[in-house]
Amino acid sequence: MEKLGINWGLLIAQLINVIFVVWLLTTFLYRPILNMLNQRTSRIQEGLQDAEKVKEQLANAKRDYDAELAKARQEAAAILAQAQERARAQAAEIIAQAHRDAEKIKSDALAQAEQERLRMLGELKDRMAELVVLTAERVLGEELKTNHDRLIEESLAELGKYN
């Protein structure tokens, strides 16, 4: 190979140098860079997984929040409906009580009017009896006896039938 201009000693030295440089580059440059790239890829994958977990947790939290909000709205609507029903019942009770009070006042007034009417009728009967006695005394000229009291009472009873 010397005819071709190849120097075996130099070729072997260069081959050893190339192998040594490849070994040096592989050991000190390629593997650390490859390890660094692998670590970075791992961190990126972990970050993506963490982001996905956070996204799922956020979706779950939103779903829970929406469920709680819907439940709270239903409870609020139920409480409002109960309050409205109680208010209607109280209003009906107040109106019924007012009607009962009005009826009692009316019946008391009617009873009082009836008592007043009876009292006035009694006074009228007494006054009429006095007038009858006075008229009879003047007509007869003397005071009526007790046996005539019965006649007066009967006359008044007859007058009471017409009232």
From Swiss-Prot:
The chain crosses the membrane at residues 9-29. It is a single-pass membrane protein. The keyword Ion transport applies. It holds the Pfam family ATP-synt_B. InterPro entries: ATP_synth_B-like_membr_sf, ATP_synth_b/b'su_bac/chlpt, ATP_synth_F0_bsu_bac, ATP_synthase_B_chain. The keyword Ion transport applies. Keywords: ATP synthesis, Cell membrane, CF(0), Hydrogen ion transport, Ion transport, Membrane, Transmembrane, Transmembrane helix, Transport. One of its GO terms (cellular component) is proton-transporting ATP synthase complex. Coiled coil: none annotated. SUPFAM superfamilies: F1F0 ATP synthase subunit B, membrane domain (SSF81573). It is found in: Cell membrane. GO terms for molecular function: proton-transporting ATP synthase activity, rotational mechanism; proton-transporting ATPase activity, rotational mechanism. F(1)F(0) ATP synthase produces ATP from ADP in the presence of a proton or sodium gradient. F-type ATPases consist of two structural domains, F(1) containing the extramembraneous catalytic core and F(0) containing the membrane proton channel, linked together by a central stalk and a peripheral stalk. During catalysis, ATP synthesis in the catalytic domain of F(1) is coupled via a rotary mechanism of the central stalk subunits to proton translocation. F-type ATPases have 2 components, F(1) - the catalytic core - and F(0) - the membrane proton channel. F(1) has five subunits: alpha(3), beta(3), gamma(1), delta(1), epsilon(1). F(0) has four main subunits: a(1), b(2) and c(10-14). The alpha and beta chains form an alternating ring which encloses part of the gamma chain. F(1) is attached to F(0) by a central stalk formed by the gamma and epsilon chains, while a peripheral stalk is formed by the delta and b chains. Belongs to the ATPase B chain family. This is ATP synthase subunit b. It comes from Roseiflexus sp. (strain RS-1).
